[in-house]
């Protein structure tokens, strides 16, 4: 029986130069594996707690030495000797050890690092790829990437309200071809921005961060880039948005669109989305309304839920109990999956299973503060999520996930790429 022999954590850096945790697990056969925990910029109120030191003399208060110490002492002490391949049991022990609903004591960053490293170590010890260990024989589907090629909102220092303008390469036979087409659109977009004397600096997730006069102009130029790159707009490559509306809303559920110089209530904002969807091939909108605006979400879901994918990120924060409430109220039809929002791999699996049981689409997702760790690439294939958000085709911490997916596709001798089937049910 494989057991946990040792656990330790180290403070390392993420892609934004902020500290994060690298957790390592050593098993009884001396197999060792590590995992680096990501961190978000725009976070939902109900996310599990990311423990920071708040010591202003180090990293402007963002150090994670306390979380590392929790791994190196409390967590290590209670997990050594447990069966390594009993992921659910170990994760439940972590939850009980913390004793709070949101990991306020140990820190979700401490807990997730150990949970990820354990899964990776167990897979390695059994000589299995991580996707096969977590997903079994049915792990065959390569996810459709949602590539964030223009950044706004909290991910960039510019005048665009919407946080992410994405492309989705749907009309392709393989992940490799879909990724190639996306890269070509990205490079074509850069040329178009250069021609307009627009900034081609990149945001946290590798997308460009130009200054536009309103929130529609990015849709126009991305549409041009798709066609100029030689692809059919809508048919081969579609558009998607992450509005991150919780960043735009006030206490009265009015949404402040600086790009349009407008203040809209929920119904007016939904009407605005309907105009955009009618004019552009937008197939997905994430966080179209605030995480607290459940009445607005119900209206959005009624108006657009049969037509496009409506993704809850801040709305559901990868939390099964919150998702269950959304299911009961017919809110949204898809959920973003971010393991660090909930705390452990097992809890993430629970949320994915609930979503799939109720025909909610799952979108595996990175965070804006990432690293070279490619865990979510394997995780997306393991659970056949069908979609993944992991940035543009720039910045090595984003490319690490794409390169891992290319490796997996090769190992699976192509696997299944469901781009053409993804939205046919709509």
Swiss-Prot record:
Entry's cofactor comment: Binds a second Mg(2+) ion via substrate during catalysis.
Catalytic residue list: 205, 338
Residue sites binding Mg(2+) per the record: 242, 286, 313
Pathway: Carbohydrate degradation; glycolysis; pyruvate from D-glyceraldehyde 3-phosphate: step 4/5
Keyword annotations from UniProtKB, A to Z: Cytoplasm, Glycolysis, Lyase, Magnesium, Metal-binding, Secreted
Gene Ontology CC annotations of this record: cell surface; extracellular region; phosphopyruvate hydratase complex
Cofactor: Mg(2+)
Main location: cytoplasm
MF annotations from Gene Ontology: magnesium ion binding; phosphopyruvate hydratase activity
Annotated function: Catalyzes the reversible conversion of 2-phosphoglycerate (2-PG) into phosphoenolpyruvate (PEP). It is essential for the degradation of carbohydrates via glycolysis.
EC number: 4.2.1.11
Pfam family, one: Enolase_C
SMART domains: Enolase_C, Enolase_N
Cellular location(s): Cytoplasm; Secreted; Cell surface
Cross-referenced Gene3D superfamilies: Enolase-like C-terminal domain, Enolase-like, N-terminal domain
Binding-site residues for (2R)-2-phosphoglycerate, renumbered to this chain: 163, 338, 367-368, 389
EC top class named in words: lyase
Protein name as catalogued: Enolase
Family recorded in the similarity comment: Belongs to the enolase family.
Catalytic reactions on record: (2R)-2-phosphoglycerate = phosphoenolpyruvate + H2O
Biological-process GO terms, alphabetical: glycolytic process
UniProt-listed PROSITE patterns: ENOLASE
Superkingdom of origin: Bacteria
Record CDD domains: enolase
């Amino acid at each position: 029986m494989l057991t946990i022999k040792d656990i330790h954590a180290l403070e390392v850096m993420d892609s934004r130069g902020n500290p994060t945790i690298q957790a390592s697990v050593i098993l009884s056969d001396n197999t060792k594996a590590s995992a680096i925990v990501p961190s978000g910029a725009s976070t939902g109120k109900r996310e599990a707690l990311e423990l920071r030191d708040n010591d202003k003399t180090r990293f402007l208060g963002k150090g994670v030495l306390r979380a590392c110490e929790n791994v190196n002492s409390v967590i290590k002490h209670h997990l050594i000797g447990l069966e390594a391949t009993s992921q659910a049991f170990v994760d439940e022990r972590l939850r009980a050890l913390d004793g709070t609903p949101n990991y306020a004591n140990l820190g979700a960053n401490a807990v997730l690092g150990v949970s990820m490293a354990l899964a990776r170590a167990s897979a390695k010890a059994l000589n299995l790829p991580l996707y096969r260990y977590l997903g079994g024989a049915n792990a065959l589907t390569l996810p459709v990437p949602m590539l964030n090629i223009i950044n706004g909102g909290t991910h960039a220092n510019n005048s665009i309200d919407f946080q992410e303008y994405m492309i989705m390469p749907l009309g392709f036979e393989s992940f490799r071809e879909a990724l190639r087409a996306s890269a070509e659109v990205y490079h074509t977009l850069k040329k178009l921005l250069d021609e307009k004397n627009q900034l081609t600096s990149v945001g946290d997730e590798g997308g460009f961060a130009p200054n536009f006069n309103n929130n529609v102009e990015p849709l126009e130029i991305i549409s041009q880039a798709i066609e100029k790159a030689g692809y059919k707009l809508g048919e081969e490559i579609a558009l998607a948005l992450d509005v991150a509306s919780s960043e735009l809303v006030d206490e009265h559920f009015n949404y402040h669109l600086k790009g349009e110089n407008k203040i809209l209530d929920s119904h007016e904002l939904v009407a605005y989305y309907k105009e955009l969807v009618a004019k552009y091939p937008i197939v997905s909108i994430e966080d179209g309304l605030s995480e607290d605006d459940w009445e607005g979400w119900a209206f959005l879901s009624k108006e657009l839920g049969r037509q496009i994918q409506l993704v809850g990120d801040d709305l559901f924060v990868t939390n099964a109990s919150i998702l269950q409430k959304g299911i009961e109220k017919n809110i949204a039809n898809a959920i973003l999956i971010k393991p660090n929002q909930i705390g452990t791999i097992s809890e993430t699996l629970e949320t994915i299973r609930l979503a799939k049981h109720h025909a909610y689409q799952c979108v595996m997702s990175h965070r804006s503060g990432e690293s070279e760790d490619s865990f979510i690439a394997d995780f997306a294939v393991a659970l056949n999520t069908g979609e993944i958000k992991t940035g543009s085709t720039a910045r090595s911490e984003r490319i690490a996930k794409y390169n891992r997916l290319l490796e997996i596709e090769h190992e699976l001798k192509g696997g299944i790429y469901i781009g053409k089937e993804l939205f046919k049910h709509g």
